[in-house]
Amino acid sequence: MADLETYFKELVDGRRKAVADRLLLAFLTPFSLVYALLMRLRRATYASGLFPVRRLGKPVISVGNIVAGGTGKTPTVATLARLLMARGKRVAVLSRGYGGSLAGEIRIVSDGKTLQATAEEAGDEPYLLAASIPRLMVVVGADRYRAGRLAEDRLNPDIFILDDGFQHLRLHRDLNILLLDSRSPFGNGRTFPAGLLREPKSALQRADIVIFTRCVEGDPPKAGVAIDKPICRASHVLTGVVPLPGGQAQPFAHLAGKKGLAFAGIADPAAFFDAMEKEGLSIIATLAFADHAGYGEDEIAAICRLKEASRASYIVTTEKDAVKLASYLDRLGPIYAAVLEVRFLDEGVVVAQLEKLLYK
């Protein structure tokens, strides 16, 4: 599965240049045009009122993207939640629970005090948010309106954050935040399946604020299109590693001089591996799994075999993967989770939008 995902990304990015690859991309292009038309029609049905848009009793902030893959939605949600909680707000995150086993069931993952679902049930991203941010409430369910109503009935939130909500048009939002990866904001500019766009670039007009993620401080984002919305730059910052199953966070220098194995089941595992090396780790072996991969006997055995073959003395992975490894830690030996934060380089832009919503 991971190999297929990698091939598809390389195909639409233009890195696959064989004749067969070019023919495949040409074959997919008409389907891409049809998909774009369908997305425009879908958007129009909600905008016209033909499909109902439901409204919760408390304000909703949506965080999402228009490009498939990792733009940093989860760490951005975490940063927003902390900003709101620092202002005394009771925050509830509404998530689909992608990759979890609940199959559409509405479930409270955290009531702000205790965890009430496992990572396998809730999905890795909702569970990570619930486990890593004290007092944050998290509810999962395919129907985010029903999930929000459950939260209103039982948790009494002041405000909601809708995780990966840009395309969830059936729920009204009071602030629509769109994330774009500064390295490649729109991929090859085509919609699925000939590109990575989940909907046409014209969807930018629905955003109230655009956040460019993975920015390098001082470098202006390059979108290639005019954006008449407030813009914030954000950087991804790795702050250190935490030993599993838990313990004091350590700087990356803690692993200096040791040879490590890195694995990840995220949208862009190669970026994670590169980041580990940039932090000074000596990574001698890597293993990529599909995004939101579940970890069972086969996956753990593959990691253990590679660790033994490479003679790595420790393993490092992402926080998102780490929450799914509790049953296997004794077999993996020394293992660490790299801690990632999103920091707003133009925080005032975001805060102004939040305060406009909170105090209107």
From Swiss-Prot:
| Pfam families attached to this UniProt entry | LpxK
- Name the family the entry cites: Belongs to the LpxK family.
GO terms for MF: ATP binding; tetraacyldisaccharide 4'-kinase activity
Q: What is the gene name?
A: lpxK
Q: In which pathway does it act?
A: Glycolipid biosynthesis; lipid IV(A) biosynthesis; lipid IV(A) from (3R)-3-hydroxytetradecanoyl-[acyl-carrier-protein] and UDP-N-acetyl-alpha-D-glucosamine: step 6/6
Which top EC class applies here? Answer: transferase
- Origin: domain of life: Bacteria
Q: What does this protein do?
A: Transfers the gamma-phosphate of ATP to the 4'-position of a tetraacyldisaccharide 1-phosphate intermediate (termed DS-1-P) to form tetraacyldisaccharide 1,4'-bis-phosphate (lipid IVA).
According to UniProt, the reaction catalysed is: a lipid A disaccharide + ATP = a lipid IVA + ADP + H(+)
Cellular component terms (Gene Ontology): plasma membrane
Task: Name the keywords, alphabetized.
Answer: ATP-binding, Kinase, Lipid A biosynthesis, Lipid biosynthesis, Lipid metabolism, Nucleotide-binding, Transferase
**Could you tell me the Gene Ontology terms of the biological process aspect for this record?**
lipid A biosynthetic process; lipopolysaccharide core region biosynthetic process
PANTHER family per record:
TETRAACYLDISACCHARIDE 4'-KINASE (PTHR42724), TETRAACYLDISACCHARIDE 4'-KINASE, MITOCHONDRIAL-RELATED (PTHR42724:SF1)
Query: What's its EC?
Result: 2.7.1.130
What is the protein named?
Tetraacyldisaccharide 4'-kinase
- Classification via NCBIfam families: lpxK (TIGR00682)
In terms of Gene3D superfamilies, this protein maps to: P-loop containing nucleotide triphosphate hydrolases
Binding annotation for ATP: V67, A68, G69, G70, T71, G72, K73, T74
